[in-house]
From Swiss-Prot:
This is Large ribosomal subunit protein bL31. NCBIfam families: L31 (TIGR00105), PRK00019.1 (NF000612), PRK00528.1 (NF001809). Disulfide bonds: none annotated. The lineage of its organism: Bacteria, Pseudomonadati, Pseudomonadota, Gammaproteobacteria, Candidatus Pseudothioglobaceae. Zn(2+) binds at residues 16, 18, 38, 41. It comes from Vesicomyosocius okutanii subsp. Calyptogena okutanii (strain HA). GO terms for cellular component: ribonucleoprotein complex; ribosome. PANTHER family: 50S RIBOSOMAL PROTEIN L31, CHLOROPLASTIC, LARGE RIBOSOMAL SUBUNIT PROTEIN BL31A. Belongs to the bacterial ribosomal protein bL31 family. Type A subfamily.
Length: 70
């Protein structure tokens, strides 16, 4: 492996807007990285995800195909 062509691999403190912090390693030159969303507060990971049904498309689909037999 060639020397001096690879980026430095530094310790980085990740800070989320929810207050969660953890330490990882990265090639960025900063000591801290501020995030808006992490796995502790993201709706997909917390189970609080909402499914948006715009204009009743699910109901329209169900009513259209309700008469078909399986």
């Amino acid at each position: 492996m060639k020397t001096s062509i690879h980026p430095n691999y530094n310790d980085v403190q990740i800070i989320c807007s929810c207050g969660n912090t953890f330490k990882t390693r990265s090639t960025i030159d900063k000591k801290e990285l501020h995030l808006d969303v992490c796995s502790s507060c993201h709706p997909f990971y917390t189970g609080k995800q909402k499914i948006m049904d715009s204009a009743g498309r699910v109901e329209k689909f169900k009513s259209r195909y309700a008469s078909f037999k399986r």
